[in-house]
From Swiss-Prot:
Record flagged with keyword Repressor: no
Gene3D superfamilies, A to Z: N-terminal domain of the delta subunit of the F1F0-ATP synthase
Source organism per UniProt: Rhizobium etli (strain ATCC 51251 / DSM 11541 / JCM 21823 / NBRC 15573 / CFN 42)
HAMAP family, sorted: ATP_synth_delta_bact
PANTHER family: ATP SYNTHASE DELTA CHAIN
Family indicated by similarity: Belongs to the ATPase delta chain family.
An example Gene Ontology CC term for this record: plasma membrane
Protein name as annotated: ATP synthase subunit delta
Self-association and partners: F-type ATPases have 2 components, F(1) - the catalytic core - and F(0) - the membrane proton channel. F(1) has five subunits: alpha(3), beta(3), gamma(1), delta(1), epsilon(1). F(0) has three main subunits: a(1), b(2) and c(10-14). The alpha and beta chains form an alternating ring which encloses part of the gamma chain. F(1) is attached to F(0) by a central stalk formed by the gamma and epsilon chains, while a peripheral stalk is formed by the delta and b chains.
Length: 188
């Protein structure tokens, strides 16, 4: 299967699972608690390369994935709908799509609140003040309230990459250095 087909499959799986989780959470009035648990789990993924590898790896059996997810959920204080959701995802061997499920859930929740969703990649964690300034700037551009999901990626070296819908603004130092490198190659 070509890479493009694999990513579309993952995206479709992620959206279906996220949609089901959102509908259940909405029905039970638990969207905020599920979102908080989602944020906690995403923070764990961002901080642990080992957890990222575990989630992405097809090597582990469904039983091993389930045991690990139960232990991780308990340690992180994740309970209720999201803990049960993680168990279903592990049993169905869909952990590889979990990062996409988290993104899709955030988009669905933001749309439900009348907001637009923005994905922000930063070299370092943003302070609450920086997040608020970014939200205000994006609201000024889009005219809507903005829900942001911040991912830390030290490889961008500095600056930000902001994705809103199909638009992307890349002010990362990595991109600027790459552009400079290409310009220097053309000159020399």
């Amino acid at each position: 299967m070509p890479v493009a087909d694999t990513s579309q499959l993952t995206s479709g799986v992620a959206e279906r699972y996220a949609s089901s989780l959102f509908e259940l959470a909405l029905e039970q009035g638990a969207v905020d608690s599920v979102t908080a648990d989602l944020d906690r789990f995403q923070a764990m993924l961002d901080e642990s390369a080992e957890l990222k590898r575990f989630v992405a790896s097809p090597v582990f059996s469904a039983e091993d994935q389930l045991k690990a997810i139960i232990a991780i959920s308990e340690r992180a204080g994740i309970s209720g709908f999201f803990a049960n959701f993680l168990k279903v995802v592990a049993r169905n061997r869909r952990l590889f799509a979990l990062p996409g499920m988290i993104k899709a859930f955030r988009v669905i929740a933001a749309n439900h609140r009348g907001e637009i969703s923005a994905e922000v990649t930063s070299a370092h964690a943003l302070t609450a003040e920086q997040e608020n300034e970014l939200k205000a700037a994006l609201k000024g551009v889009t005219g809507k309230d903005v829900a942001i999901a911040v991912t830390v990626d030290p490889s961008i070296l500095g600056g930000l990459i902001v994705k809103v819908g199909s638009r992307q603004i890349d002010t990362s130092l990595r991109t600027k250095l790459s552009t400079l490198k290409l310009a220097l190659k053309e000159v020399g």
